Amino acid sequence: MEVFASNWASRFGQLCLCAGLVLLPALTQAAESDPWEGFNRPVFTFNDTIDTYALKPLAQGYQAITPQFLEDGIHNVFNNVGDVGNLANDLLQGKVEEAGIDTSRVLFNTTFGLLGFFDVGTKMGLQRNDEDFGQTLGVWGLNSGPYLVLPLLGPSTVRDASGKIPDSFLEPYSYINDVPARNVARVVDVVDTRASLLSAEKFISGDKYSFIRNAYLQMREFKVKDGEVEDDF
C-alpha cells in the first residue's frame, strides 16, 4: 500500500486537476494508445477497489482528526523530500534554471523551513517543479509506448513504468535503517497524499477508467513538452 499512495493517489489527483487539458478530439487518440485495455481494466478495478475500501477511508479519517496547519506541514515535508528527485531530473533534462530553483527550494525549506514543514521556498517565489525519470526519458526522445495500468502503482505507460526504477533510488525510505520508522514514514506519506486529493474526485465524469486514461496521457504529454502540446486545429 505504501507504493500505491506515492503513485496512484498522487497521479489520481493530478489527473482530476488537469482534466481541463483533455480535449475531445484527443479522446480517440488516447483510445488508440490503449491496445492492452483487456488487461488494464481489471487491474484498474483492483486498484480502485483498494482505494475505495482502504486508502480513501483512512485518508478521510486522517483529514478529520488532523489540524489543517499540521496536515499542511506534513504535506510540505514530503514535498521537500520529493524536490530532490525533481532536482536530479532537472539536471538530466538539461534544465539548468529549474535545477537552480529546486536546489534553492531544498536548501531554504530544509533549513529555514524546519526540514520542509514550512514551504518558505514558494513564499520566496521559488515555484516547485514536478519532474520524474519517465519525463526525462520522454525529453530524451523515447516514445511513451502503450498505456499500462500497474497493480497498486496505477496509470502509466511502458516508458513511465521503466522510469520508476531510477526514481525509486531517490526516495529516502530505502535509506532509513530503522524498519518501524521507515514503515511509519511510508504510511503517513500514503495517507497524507490521498487526503490532499479528496476534493479532486468531483472532476471525474463518465466512465472512470476512460477518464483517468485520457487525462493521464494528456497530462504526461503536457509535462514532457513543458506545456507546449501541439494543437490539432
Residues covered by each model-derived region:
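Sec/Tat signal peptide C-region and signal peptidase I cleavage site
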Residues: 24-31
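Short N-terminal segments immediately surrounding and downstream of signal-peptide cleavage
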Residues: 32-46
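A structured, mid-to-C-terminal "fold-capping" secondary-structure block
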Residues: 31, 135, 140-233
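Mid-length scaffold segments of soluble, non-membrane domains
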Residues: 80-155
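Short alpha-helical hairpin
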Residues: 31-33, 48-59, 82
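Bacterial N-terminal signal peptides
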Residues: 13-24
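N-terminal secretory signal peptides that target proteins for export/translocation
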Residues: 1-9
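Membrane interface segments of multi-pass transport proteins and intramembrane proteases
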Residues: 53-69, 134
